[in-house]
Each structure stands twice: as C-alpha cells, then as structure tokens.
Amino acid sequence: MEGLEEICFEIISHSGQAKGLLMEAVTDSRAEHPDYSAIETMLKDARDGLKVAQKAHLKVLSDFAQSGQGDAVNPLYIHAEDQMMSAEIFLDLLSELITTNKKLQEIKQQL
C-alpha cells in the first residue's frame, strides 16, 4: 500500500502527542492549585489528536479492504495501531483520574 509508512508515522505521532498531553494534564491535576481550564484544554487537544490518528487508522483499514491486502502483516502498522490504542486507554483512564483529583481537591478545600 502506497503511503502506509507515512500514515503509520502520522498515527504514531498524534497518539504520542496525545499521551504526552494526558500525562501533563494528570500531573497538573495533582498540583496544590490546579488550573482546570488549562487541564481541560490539554484533554481537548489530546482528544483532537486522537481523532486525527483514528481518521488515519480508518484510511489504512479502508485501503487494506479495497486492495485485498487486509491479511498482510506490517510491523510498523501494528506498532502504530498499538500506540493509538494505548493513547485511547490513557484518555479514558486519565480523564477519570483527573475527575477524581478534582473531587479530592474540592474535599480538601472544605476541610
């Protein structure tokens, strides 16, 4: 498939960027006085980056289906898909952790 390598690197790049933003957001959420507006922006940017990765992933799947090469194994594609899937899991888990940190912060302020 033509351009597969470039698409894989696009998926890897956007997924990695999303994971970095998510780690920064969760770290910031544990600060003494977290800026939840900035944290929400990081979460949005991570989601947006993942949407780009998912769109590229869908193109690869579509191209595989149309070309009949769907059973071909490409290690770079497997790595790209793994990076995207782990970023999606990060998004789900760290979003919940940030919500928990926010609730803990509210409880601390009441004490």
Residue spans for each PLM region:
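Terminal alpha-helical segments
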Residues: 1-111
